Amino acid sequence: MITRAAKLLLLAGIALNYTLVVFNNVTDFDSNYQFVHHVLLMDSTFPGNHGMGRAIPSPGLQLAFYFSIITWEIATTILLWWGVVRLLRALKLPASAFNAAKRVPIMARTLSMLMWLVAFLDVGAEWFLMWQSRTWNGQEAAFRMFAVVGLVLLILLQPDVEGAP
């Protein structure tokens, strides 16, 4: 029961984090948009780099990219909280039911990991050379979230068996 509760609480912690991320992106829209704007504009990368042709100067496309991130985060948040409810309902049920209840949280955490990996580490850091920026480099935060969510996903993936602590 303790192991199941730990899995549930860790999932709830990530769901809370995502709720706050969405809240911040919506209520402090411009500050967070500026991050996306500058990464896509590539205006703080190394002078003279040969990747500047990748930059997206269109504010409309930058806004669309930012909205897609927020939409991804909202979808992930909904799945995370849905997963919390599913695990909570299955907390005292047989191990097979608890294991089955993990499907939604596994999808949610995978969606989360894909966002941090694809949107920030692959597209932002590598394609738009975010790693070159002293001001708009979100690699450390993205990797931190990727690692935390991944660790919790690995914990959740451990099968539950009858009689486990």
Model feature map: region roles:
Residues 3-35:
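N-terminal signal-anchor transmembrane alpha helix
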Residues 24-37, 83-96, 125-132:
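Juxtamembrane transmembrane-helix termini
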Residues 24-40, 73, 105-112:
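Alpha-helical transmembrane segments of integral membrane proteins, especially early/N-terminal helices
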Residues 30-61:
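Membrane-interface interhelical connector segments
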Residues 55-76:
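Individual transmembrane alpha-helix segments
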Residues 78-110:
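Cytoplasmic juxtamembrane regions at transmembrane-helix boundaries
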Residues 110-165:
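Alpha-helical transmembrane segments of multi-pass integral membrane proteins
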